[in-house]
Amino acid sequence: MFKYYGVFNIPMYLTLFRIIMVPCFVAVFYWPIYWSPMLCTLIFFIAAITDWFDGFLARRWNQTSRIGGFLDPIADKIMIITALILISEHFHVWWMTLPISSIIIREILISSLRECIARVDNKNNISVIWLSKVKTFAQMLALIALLCRLNEWTVIMGVISLYTAMLLTLWSMCYYVYSVSSILLQYKLK
């Protein structure tokens, strides 16, 4: 349908847009006006929608690229980790920091593991599993609810979703580490 013009195509622009939106929602998060949580949540939601949309369009229009495959997960991590840090800083209690730090540690560990596997064996890679998709959904639900903070029930729903995301995060991390352990052991033996 659309002609491919090298690296810069619509899916790539959406990925770059997502990265550019991060400083915007950070700035809005700290605005000292009563509706800043709603605007911050709206910006985050729009950025999150582009995450789904850029992958869909890249596959649909056959505009996938190596740089897009590299930048897309980085844009996701930047957006999610920034939102998690803002939420942790806002609530400033251990029972929020615990799941948030667990999720951040997992994101860094799995990203490092992907890089390690790519260097050791380019034939194998860590593909996304259904569990990670469920984790991402719970995580996005938690982030939207906790950024928005409409009322007490929204915060409670956000905290429940955050702990659900943490459990799914740890489960998927164990799965990923187990699934690549044979590749890592082969590399260690060489």
UniProtKB/Swiss-Prot annotation:
The chain crosses the membrane at residues 18-42, 66-86, 92-112, 151-173. Keywords: Cell inner membrane, Cell membrane, Lipid biosynthesis, Lipid metabolism, Membrane, Phospholipid biosynthesis, Phospholipid metabolism, Transferase, Transmembrane, Transmembrane helix. Pathway: Phospholipid metabolism; phosphatidylglycerol biosynthesis; phosphatidylglycerol from CDP-diacylglycerol: step 1/2. The keyword Chloroplast does not apply. It is a multi-pass membrane protein. GO terms for biological process: phosphatidylglycerol biosynthetic process. This is CDP-diacylglycerol--glycerol-3-phosphate 3-phosphatidyltransferase. The lineage of its organism: Bacteria, Pseudomonadati, Pseudomonadota, Gammaproteobacteria, Enterobacterales.
